[in-house]
Amino acid sequence: MSSKAIRCFSFTASRDWFYRYSFANAGLRSAATDLGDGTVMHCWVPKIPKPSKPNLFLIHGFGANAMWQYGEHLRHFISRFNVYVPDLLFFGESFTTRPERTESFQAECTMKLMEAHGVQKTSVVGISYGGFVAYSLAAQFPEAVEKLVLCCAGVCLEEKDMNDGLFNVSSLEEASTILLPQTPEKLKELMRFSFVRPARGVPNWFLTDFIQVMCSDYVEEKRELIDTILKDRQLSNLPKINQPTLIIWGEQDKIFPLELGHRLKRHVGESAQIVIIKNAGHAVNLEKPREFAKHLKAFLFDSQSSPSEPSFLEQLQKKFDLSK
């Protein structure tokens, strides 16, 4: 492929199209829901929800849209759950004209989205920033959240942690330039922060293409989301939750250090368990996808939260009425 052809062809847009195709092929459809007051949330929802199945919401973090963060994991859950994959506000096709930027508001909008699609109860998986939203959802609407998975979500951070040197950055402004990369150099820096073994030798034109497609919309609004996460944050103000909770953390997370995972476990208490994945960083869902999926399935798949798949013999008995 010539350099001119490469410039005209977007690998990122093509990958995004592939994810759209795979989500649709898995039985989901793209749906934009008007929540009122200038707020629209996009979500991948089941084409035909089955009342016999439990529900599962997969909430993404910063970075590309929700499809990119859960695309490799969707196949593990689609047969057992009614799966919903929303784009949080200012990501993908979701937006609001309202001024609120808190994870509490994101959670309220997610709850309205659930109600709009007739979902009364659900289990929730939240990655990084999505974990902040998932935690708030569980705290505000405890009757709606059955089980909770929080992956590398620094919910228990405090504003003073920045000054105390817990993070690898010294200011929110520095964090924003990394989490919202606008140059190939900053995207490479984000990759070094997110992965234990980041890809090497990625050409700048490829990184620029990714930034143009995935990182150029709602940049200022996303900066405000980051600012709001840390402002005046104190652990003493974080509400308790009682739902069964799985905490997953990359052992070498450089964005939200492992100390925050242990802090979260102590805060939630006996209803929480923590799994630490070795040789993984912040993007543990992408860096260790098999191990990540294994722990999700072990926690979410049980006789109470999902129907068991009938065996081949049971299918034969049902088809030919052999039980009589």
Task: Enumerate the predicted regions with their spans.
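Catalytic active-site module of serine/aspartate enzymes centered on a nucleophile-bearing elbow/loop
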Residues: 270-324
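Flexible "cap/lid" loop of the alpha/beta hydrolase fold
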Residues: 135, 139-140, 144-182
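Conserved alpha/beta-hydrolase catalytic His-Asp/Glu region
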Residues: 159-167, 178-242
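Active-site loop/oxyanion-hole signature of alpha/beta-hydrolase fold enzymes
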Residues: 48-50, 75, 84-125, 294
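Conserved HGGG/HGGXW glycine-rich cap/lid loop of the alpha/beta-hydrolase fold
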Residues: 45-93
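Short beta-strand/loop motif that positions the catalytic acidic residue
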Residues: 241, 247-249, 253
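Short alpha-helix in the alpha/beta-hydrolase fold that links the catalytic acid
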Residues: 243, 257-266
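Alpha/beta-hydrolase fold catalytic core
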Residues: 1-56, 79-81, 301-324
